[in-house]
Amino acid sequence: MAEELGLGFGEAVPVEMLPEGCRHRREARTGLAARSKACLALTCCLLSFPILAGLSTLLMTGQLRIPGKDCMFPTVTEERSAPSAQPVYTPSRDKPKAHLTIMRQTPVPHLKNELAALHWENNLGMAFTKNRMNYTNKFLVIPESGDYFIYSQITFRGTTSECGDISRVRRPKKPDSITVVITKVADSYPEPAHLLTGTKSVCEISSNWFQPIYLGAMFSLEEGDRLMVNVSDISLVDYTKEDKTFFGAFLI
């Protein structure tokens, strides 16, 4: 509202006066600003509390290193590694194996340069075949592919030595040497393969002699392979005891 103010010079100057409502609105705006600042301060306090609590927890558990400090609380952590793939292990009791012992041989005619195959006992005394290993018709049959240790000991015995310059009439009764061969027969190979061979001279041996030949080694075999033992003179093989002449194989 406007009022006239006299200045003493005969003139009146109008003065603009603020109404009462405007003063109330200015005071209201000032109070609202003060309350907003108070609410903001309270909100900051409430938000900072969980942050401070989390930092305190990290410090207590040793997960946060304080700059300038070399010490930190030790923590015990349990490491759990994922299980790694392990090769399949077959217990020895489940692996194919066989141990054959000698039996009395029946001499059969064969070619001059051909080695006779021995017959074996497979289920009496010390002899056995286990876990699908099979013996049939002089052959030890391999049931599954793998690395096998094959062994054999053949003991020869004689009563006279007929080597050197002995007459040809008696010479065919006794050879100059004795030979043992472990042979593999496979369907995938056209001819028998000699795996192991052992030879000894008997010319220097006097009467009533015994001479063992042992063979043994590891071979990679396929399912269906057949093994046999051949000798140069089947009539000289000692079959009196099963611990003198034997033949066997087992999967490693």
Curated annotation (Swiss-Prot):
Bilayer topology: Single-pass type II membrane protein
Pfam families: TNF
Residues glycosylated per entry: 134, 230
Coiled coil: none
Compartments (UniProt record): Membrane
Superkingdom: Eukaryota
GO cellular component labels: extracellular space; plasma membrane
Residues spanning the membrane: 40-60
GO function term, MF aspect, one: cytokine activity
InterPro entries to which the protein is assigned, alphabetical: TNF (IPR006053), TNF_dom (IPR006052), Tumour_necrosis_fac-like_dom (IPR008983)
Topological domain ranges for the Extracellular compartment: 61-252
Disulfide bond annotation, renumbered to this chain: 163-203
GO BP annotation list: cell surface receptor signaling pathway; immune response; positive regulation of canonical NF-kappaB signal transduction; positive regulation of extrinsic apoptotic signaling pathway
Domain THD: residue ranges: 96-252
Cytoplasmic side of membrane: 1-39
Annotated keywords: Cytokine, Disulfide bond, Glycoprotein, Membrane, Signal-anchor, Transmembrane, Transmembrane helix
Site feature location: Important for binding TNFRSF6B: 188, 191
Summary of subunit composition and partner proteins: Homotrimer.
Family per record: Belongs to the tumor necrosis factor family.
Its job: Receptor for TNFRSF25 and TNFRSF6B. Mediates activation of NF-kappa-B. Inhibits vascular endothelial growth and angiogenesis (in vitro). Promotes activation of caspases and apoptosis. Promotes splenocyte alloactivation.
Name of the molecule in the record: Tumor necrosis factor ligand superfamily member 15
Organism this protein belongs to: Rattus norvegicus
Lineage: Eukaryota, Metazoa, Chordata, Craniata, Vertebrata
Chain's gene name: Tnfsf15
